[in-house]
Amino acid sequence: MRLSLDSFRAGLHPGSTYRVAFSGGLDSAVLLDLMCQVRRVSGIGVRAIHVHHGIQPEADAWSRHCAAVADRYGVALDILQIDGRSRPGDSPEAAARTARYHSLEASLDPGDILVTAQHLDDQAETLLLQLLRGAGLAGLAAMPNAVPFGAGILHRPLLRFGRRDILAYAQERGLSWIEDPSNRDERYDRNFIRRRILPQLAGRWPAVAANLTRSAGHCAEAAGLLDRLADTLMAAATAADEPGTLVLEIVQRLQPDEQRLLLRRWIHKRGLRAPPAKLLERIRKEVVETAGDRTPMIAWAEGTVRRYRHRLHLLPPSADFDASWTAAWSGETPLTLAGNGCLHAALCPGPGIDPDKWRSGRITVRYRRAGDRLEPAGRRGHHELKKLFQEAGLPPWLRDRQPIVCIDGRIASVGGSQWLASEFAGAPERVNIVVHWTP
């Protein structure tokens, strides 16, 4: 498709404020030029963003070039400084891309539309990369045209146009751009596909980029259907009295492929990346399908799936905390529990700690110790905390994290105000001190 102002505007996501990701290269130079033309004829707001990765020695010169171009267009330019260096185990490409997108996402205001310059050939490269990595449908869907992004929307208005169309437009308009030497480095997978593989495929099948992009669209449609099916399965399996957990019996009645679909969606909905396929299958077999009352668990870098009392629990990585920690607390300001949330106290009607005993005693906060006992308000006799936790069905991995509030060294409440000691409990018809724990 020939790239022109009219053909570009026809596919532009409607909006009033656009942020143009501007690297200074060919593709983003064309994108900025087009957006400025749209601004001239329709009055939209346009602002450019340049990400300074600090990797290439030419990075400072590129920033100056982008500033000069933006100035000629009369467009404000924001330069975001990031550390794009890779960490152990990450590819340089992935590290730079992740850092770039995080910075762009954080820069958006509500209602902003971030436009980036990926095009038809980029889409074909992405699909080939995902195929070679053994990706599933979501990965093979490649790059969407528009997607929620931070406070705004990420939009790729050039996906319908090929690299040749973009180059022809730039030459017609007399645009200038910078060349990133790393784009010629075939040690990077994407460059190898771009420079070696796609040209050979195009020599045999000239429409290869368009055809691969069409296949990516089919995969995106199928992935959307599966997501909706997974949401239906998850709604049926989610415990009504414990949102976020799945009822084991319901999950066990599903077919293996439905179980895998559900597990992936469940993990994704919690904001975590699903484990590799082999590990997901281990979770299905060893945690879901294992018979009896066992409490198996499987962890990976992103989280842990555990089974307890006929429920499946998904836990994000927990911050380390010191079980021997103790601290004095006035109760007048919130108390931060390192790696375990915070406590705050408030006067509220209903069950709580007697305000007079609260004010007259020395308040400390700690965690469970061997032999800790409590006489719960409204019950006779002292009980080990371990037994109280078991009665309440508190999962084992949460028991040692329950903050314990003591007055003059004696337990007054546990887990915020979930368990109150009878000797410190106020009359329930009065206004009392209620301790709230936010994990």
Swiss-Prot record:
Which residues does the record give as ATP binding sites? S23, G24, G25, L26, D27, S28
Keywords, ordered alphabetically: ATP-binding, Cytoplasm, Ligase, Nucleotide-binding, tRNA processing
Reaction(s) catalyzed by this protein? cytidine(34) in tRNA(Ile2) + L-lysine + ATP = lysidine(34) in tRNA(Ile2) + AMP + diphosphate + H(+)
What CDD domains is this protein classified in? TilS_N
EC supergroup of this enzyme: ligase
Q: Is ATP-binding given among the entry's keywords?
A: yes
Which GO terms of the molecular function aspect are on file? Answer: ATP binding; tRNA(Ile)-lysidine synthase activity
Write the Enzyme Commission number(s) for this entry: 6.3.4.19
What subcellular locations does the record give? Cytoplasm
Gene Ontology CC, one term: cytoplasm
What function does the entry list?
Ligates lysine onto the cytidine present at position 34 of the AUA codon-specific tRNA(Ile) that contains the anticodon CAU, in an ATP-dependent manner. Cytidine is converted to lysidine, thus changing the amino acid specificity of the tRNA from methionine to isoleucine.
In the record, the note on similarity to other proteins reads: Belongs to the tRNA(Ile)-lysidine synthase family.
* Free-text note regarding domains: The N-terminal region contains the highly conserved SGGXDS motif, predicted to be a P-loop motif involved in ATP binding.
UniProt name for this protein: tRNA(Ile)-lysidine synthase
